[in-house]
Amino acid sequence: SSNLGAGYVDNSGPAGLSQSLVDNYLNADGTPIDPADGIFKDFNLTFKGRDGRLLATVMHSNCKFKSTSPESKSKAMLVEEYSEENKSVVRPPYLTEGGPARNATGYHIRMSIDTTYVSGQGETSLPMIRYAEALLAYAEAAEELGKCTPAVLEKTLKPLRERAGVTYADPSEIDPNFTDFGYAISANLQEIRRERRAELALQG
């Protein structure tokens, strides 16, 4: 489909996911990343050993979709420059030209793309509220009221992280690379907010 060929963007103008969102996702072992680590300058290594929700949200190498190309029913996203000759392949960010096909940040959106169609029409569900959102709201309310015990987090954060393939550990230290809100927050609240962003990114 045309939107896959250009990268999934807002039809009215350039779009893209932020570096801040990509950095928000933990490593699979439950530790936060250090954005200053040179390993994250490599596009492919950015996704290695990370929270499974990062891979479900952001386009990365080897994402496969139905293709309009007659010689193949499935093509992987290729790490190469955009070319007018091969418009049916999902390719890395189209950064150098103007228009609605341009990706403004370098990170394509993968979430909610229907990978089964090729004609420009497809359907994806749009949940109004998710169980995960209820768990996170409960955890945050408990923290704000001073009632967020390890038992609360084991019933709220832990199942969400484990479902995404991330090792869970009780929050104990502040991540110095986390978003600075301009005021101090607890380690619990930091991880609840991280989890909300990771779990509900692009879902309204």
Feature names for model-found ranges:
Residues S1-Q19, D23-G204:
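Acidic/polar-rich alpha-helix caps and helix-coil junctions
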